[in-house]
């Protein structure tokens, strides 16, 4: 009985000793990715055209302030939406960037035309690499620009 108890104790000690693992000495890798979108629309008519750019990002922490637009941080906004009225004034180009690394990004783009044509450009850079670069796309009554991208 004593011999069995000693063997069991020894087995328990050895199990505990070898099941403990040394902590990693390196710092954990930063997760997430950075993004920069450049969107231009020229010739948009607010009464005849439909333009919609929606960019949504998120991280695992539920951070709400994700984006800056043309250098201005958009507090408490995880999504940015641009419509036809954003392109009929003096600003025709918008640069939308993450203010911190995010885990998921999705974009939805729809440009329709019902009269005179207009041009759009959509460029997506993820971690500094150009992923999508549709430059000078003409949108007219026969050709729309409708896409959904996940990065």
What positions do the PLM features span?
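Low-complexity, intrinsically disordered regions enriched in charged/polar residues
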Residues: 1, 7-11, 47, 99
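Bacterial Sec-dependent N-terminal signal peptides
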Residues: 3-7, 13-38
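First exposed extracellular module after export/assembly in secreted or surface-exposed proteins
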Residues: 28-151
């Amino acid at each position: 009985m004593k011999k069995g108890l000693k063997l069991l104790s020894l087995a328990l000690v050895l199990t505990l000793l070898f099941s403990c693992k040394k902590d990693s000495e390196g710092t954990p890798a930063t997760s997430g990715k950075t993004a920069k979108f450049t969107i231009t629309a020229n010739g948009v008519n607010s009464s005849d055209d439909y333009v919609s750019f929606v960019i949504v990002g998120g991280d695992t922490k539920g951070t709400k302030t994700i984006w800056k637009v043309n250098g201005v941080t958009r507090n408490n906004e995880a999504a940015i939406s641009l419509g036809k009225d954003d392109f009929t004034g003096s600003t025709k180009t918008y640069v939308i960037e993450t203010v911190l690394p995010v885990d998921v990004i999705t974009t939805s783009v729809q440009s329709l035309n019902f009269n005179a044509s207009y041009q759009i450009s959509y460029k997506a850079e993820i971690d500094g690499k150009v992923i999508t670069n549709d430059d000078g796309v003409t949108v007219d009554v026969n050709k729309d620009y409708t896409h959904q991208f996940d990065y």
